[in-house]
């Protein structure tokens, strides 16, 4: 059943749309307001010509001066809208990538005519939705492409620049055409839906967290909800010097304009300590979930190794706490848009979602389960919520083995293990051959699962440890040992998909803007094991993320490693594995200390989020497993600075 907030919102949209359509017309007293001309059969339908759509480019004024030149920043906005007197809502994507790096699987850029007016937009949103009575608005983020100012990587300048566009669309701002004429948004109802993947989806989260009026819905795809959770892993930097580098990677201003701003970003990020400070707090949208007025449709890869899944889960939980209308799509691929995973189902969902939240059409999209989740390649399930209802933490003990693997079970923990930091340890070495004795990692194995086990939520590992150095990274990896067909989410630049030779079309095309896109498929391999989840933490942040507190060598401490959230079924007969190590230079950029660490297993535990039965028992000795990683499976390299 649709919740009351959703029904009230949709009713209000329908009323406003009808009134705006009838401005200047005299309706019969008893007649029902007719729907807009592009609504038929309970949905928007292709009505307007995409080829003859209005295409215009404007500069929106802001109150920002992010480049400190004494002149307010302006934001470049490109618009494609139906040629009609009927006011229409807006689908908007703000991005830093329109001129530098491209959008979508085919890395498309904006293209302009000789007068500087938009000619071709990336992606299919304009092709598909403009004929159906929507405008599509593409915003160049401050400091990029044709906008002025300097970007601040998810900070007040970037969020404020996009918020200014929402304000203008609702009559609260000013803008000009490129020839200086005043641009007025009299063609829109003012209802805006933001969408975008990665950094673009992050902007949707950030603008929604301001509570700006007129933003009715957002669709963040692989979006960041906290830049600390993107660039730091509980105190461990993923890459050094990253904020300034990232701002520079998308910088569209004349050389040198933003150098000082970018240097300040890197300094404020504080690589030295890894602390969560005011810089990161200004880029953390989760605490402001209570300000969100928009509904939220989240899509995220559970195995996204660019924007880790913690970014969706913390945001989802905060939105739930404040009763924000929301739905969630989860898949097993990496940093990928659902358009390239389950294209037909995703476009159907977007169509219904925007019809409901922007047009006020009561189509039932908010009914039924909140979550659609892919738990294995192309095996989608509906789920009432995330984590799955009834999921609870199951605490398992760890015990030492006789020089090889230790055990995971329901009995008591015992023994100790010693670890020596090895910055050259690869993930394949760490999780492969789990029974082999190694000084740089410890492995623990369960009995064979007696039935299918459903993991849904965030695993954690709590360790009692001592170190001979004042600081060290601690790494934990949860592994499913057993042969199965698994998505290779590391393939093709962490996407997990590959192109086919065919194309499918979504909307109308012109000679300059095709609506046809390469079809794709998931990269799937049969493997003997799969890493379910990873987690990292810094020993000097064991008491909190705001203060670097070195450990006293030789003293015992307790620390909890939060792994990334997951939702997956473990098959009967498989073995659950836990791998604990120190530095992980394939995923992070720690200051490797060469520490020697001892773990007290009697006071260490693995906590699994299990929905239903656990199907694990006690085990006296670790099972002997033989596993082989296929040569075709993608491998990692030293972590590079990459674009979100």
Feature-to-residue mapping (PLM):
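C-terminal, loop-rich substrate-recognition/catalytic regions characterized by aromatic stacking residues
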Residues: 35-44, 343-644
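Secretory targeting and sorting signals
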Residues: 2-32
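Short beta-strand/loop motif that positions the catalytic acidic residue
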Residues: 292, 298-300, 304
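Conserved alpha/beta-hydrolase "acid-adjacent" motif
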Residues: 305-311
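Catalytic nucleophile-loop/oxyanion-hole region of alpha/beta-hydrolase
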Residues: 145-166, 173, 338-346
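Conserved alpha/beta-hydrolase
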Residues: 130-146
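Accessory cap/linker subdomain of secreted extracellular hydrolases
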Residues: 45, 64, 72-73, 77, ...
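Catalytic-loop region of hydrolases
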Residues: 30-108, 112-115, 122-125, 135, ...
